[in-house]
């Protein structure tokens, strides 16, 4: 279900059309209209759309569909550092790597939004387009995605760590100027 809808393909087209490697989540939300949802994706309240640089208007039917796809991309960025857009749509998208950047507050809100869908899938407008078994399966997939993204190895990831908080752990570090072998555990 994640990555398999018209909304998914339109999201890939949107990301490809941005023509940059690093895209802030807040910018994606603003350009598509997801920011008007105020992190509540149960009902798609506004018409979500963007106009492609070639002039074609592309719309999104279900806010939660786009959000779960973005979460899957965030997970890939977390694991690999970036995602190749061609891997998301091999037929229509050229090979190009992108990374979505997210603030700690956005991570917290995303975690809550995914958890809400996983716990209450029938409260979402998307459930009107799927039978009960399909929406429950998607809810299980979203919960697995959420856990992988935010509870890896059974620990909550802390996205609030600042560079200053880590400096005391490496008092002899002077800067990166090459690759060295070390016995230091990081």
Predicted segments, located by residue:
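Amphipathic alpha-helical elements of HEAT/ARM-like alpha-solenoid repeat scaffolds that form extended
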Residues: 7-14, 67, 71-74, 146
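Structural recognition of alpha-solenoid helical scaffolds
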Residues: 10, 24, 37-43, 66, ...
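Amphipathic protein-protein interaction modules
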Residues: 62-127
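Non-catalytic all-alpha helical scaffold/repeat segments
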Residues: 27-51, 115-122, 162-167, 172-173
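N-terminal leader/targeting peptides and immediately adjacent processing regions
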Residues: 1-41
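Low-complexity intrinsically disordered segments
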Residues: 110-177
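Structural motif
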Residues: 51-66
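Hydrophobic core segments within long, regular secondary-structure runs in both alpha-
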Residues: 26-29, 33, 42-45, 71, ...
């Amino acid at each position: 279900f994640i990555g398999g809808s018209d909304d998914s393909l339109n999201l890939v087209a949107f990301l490809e059309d941005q023509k940059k490697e690093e895209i802030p989540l807040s910018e994606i939300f603003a350009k598509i209209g997801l920011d008007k949802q105020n992190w509540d994706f149960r009902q798609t309240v506004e018409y979500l759309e963007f106009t492609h640089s070639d002039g074609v208007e592309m719309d999104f039917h279900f806010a939660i569909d786009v959000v779960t796809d973005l979460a899957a991309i965030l997970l890939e960025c977390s694991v690999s550092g970036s995602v190749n857009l061609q891997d998301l749509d091999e037929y229509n998208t050229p090979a190009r790597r992108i990374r979505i950047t997210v603030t700690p507050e956005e991570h917290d809100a995303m975690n809550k939004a995914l958890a809400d869908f996983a716990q209450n899938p029938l409260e979402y407008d998307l459930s009107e387009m799927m039978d009960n078994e399909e929406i429950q399966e998607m809810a299980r997939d979203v919960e697995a995605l959420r856990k992988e993204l935010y509870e890896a190895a059974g620990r909550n990831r802390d996205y609030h760590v600042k560079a200053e908080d880590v400096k005391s752990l490496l008092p002899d570090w002077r800067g990166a100027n090459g690759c060295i072998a070390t016995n230091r555990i990081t």
